[in-house]
A protein has these predicted regions:
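RNA pseudouridine synthases
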Residues: 1-6
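Catalytic-pocket segment enriched in acidic/His residues
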Residues: 12-155
């Protein structure tokens, strides 16, 4: 068993289109990079998680500040499924997720585990002749980014 940093990427434009399903939101090619390696023998419960967007800190929190701690999450998962060697469990992200654009450099750092660095690539346009097309709404932005995000001229109502 071990721990690693992960960048839990999501394309929330599909959230409304797919009636809440997270398959396309979280399951596109290149999503969820993990690394820089798996580290064992580290107690991450007091680790600091930091996310950088183009060198600027946009998320900064302790693992111990999570609403559901690692011990609770593992116990809850084990009540419902068998965990096998090699299974990856993502525990969540600190508040203040931010949108990314092609060319942005995203770094996820967990103290004791290292720093994962990724550059956002342009994704191919969806095939307009097949399936539901991506769309964005104010409600989706609020869920995806948190209510404190300044969306510019996008109005987010309560």
């Amino acid at each position: 068993a071990g721990f690693a940093a992960a960048n839990d990427v999501g394309c929330h434009d599909y959230r409304d289109t797919d009636a809440g399903s997270m398959l396309r939101v979280k399951g596109m090619d290149g999503f969820c990079p993990i690394g820089p390696g798996i580290v064992s023998g580290v107690d991450v419960r007091e680790s600091l998680i930091r996310t950088y967007l183009n060198g600027e800190v946009v998320q900064d929190a302790l693992v111990s500040d999570m609403i559901f701690g690692i011990d609770y999450q593992l116990a809850d998962l084990c009540r419902h499924m068998t965990l096998l060697p090699g299974d990856m469990i993502l525990t969540g992200t600190p508040a203040n997720s931010r949108p990314m654009q092609p060319g942005d450099v995203i770094e996820v750092e967990v103290s004791g585990l290292g720093r994962l660095t990724n550059t956002v690539a342009e994704r191919p346009a969806p095939n307009e002749a097949v399936g539901h097309q991506p769309a964005c709404s104010e409600a989706v932005r609020r869920v995806a980014l948190g209510s404190d995000f300044d969306a510019g001229d996008v109005r987010i109502e309560d």
